[in-house]
């Protein structure tokens, strides 16, 4: 499948990254986690004391994606591997705000388009099918109930040793949905030619097989 690109979009904790990794593995394609790119920039934003001059921040940022056979995609921010810090609560709380800024979006989208130019890419995010890969051969818009998404996020946090409250996670996910869908730049929306896939109550394998059956 080195001659096609696959775009997976959807709201927070809909299972995009997990499924994208599995689909890429099954098809021997390269998985690109665009959310990690925005999280890396958010991490730098926080480390620099939340500066509001995003043009300056981006102009002084170097971002690279590398691939490790064991650990998978790694994010190098200014030549340092920051991958293990990107799921911290503080980063999660600020990433929507940072990702909504035009300099940040333009910077990340440029890198994403360059990565996808050679084809053979599975990419997940919120504007992949609409902005980054409008010509992707397969576009899937993944959804799931807020309750299930909160439970998934709590399990992810537990695996990473991060404490979280389920009800608070539900509120945060609902707030994130509203923010992502209503921001001016690259709002979360389904591409006209995308196929909607509800992952509520489905296993990783079931969802993976459904997507593979669309090819």
Curated annotation (Swiss-Prot):
It comes from the Bacteria. ATP binds at residues 10-18. GO terms for biological process: nucleobase-containing small molecule interconversion; pyrimidine nucleotide metabolic process. It is found in: Cytoplasm. One of its GO terms (molecular function) is CMP kinase activity. It catalyses: CMP + ATP = CDP + ADP; dCMP + ATP = dCDP + ADP. Keywords: ATP-binding, Cytoplasm, Kinase, Nucleotide-binding, Transferase. Its EC number is 2.7.4.25. Pfam families: Cytidylate_kin (PF02224). One of its GO terms (cellular component) is cytosol. Belongs to the cytidylate kinase family. Type 1 subfamily. This is Cytidylate kinase. It comes from Staphylococcus epidermidis (strain ATCC 35984 / DSM 28319 / BCRC 17069 / CCUG 31568 / BM 3577 / RP62A).
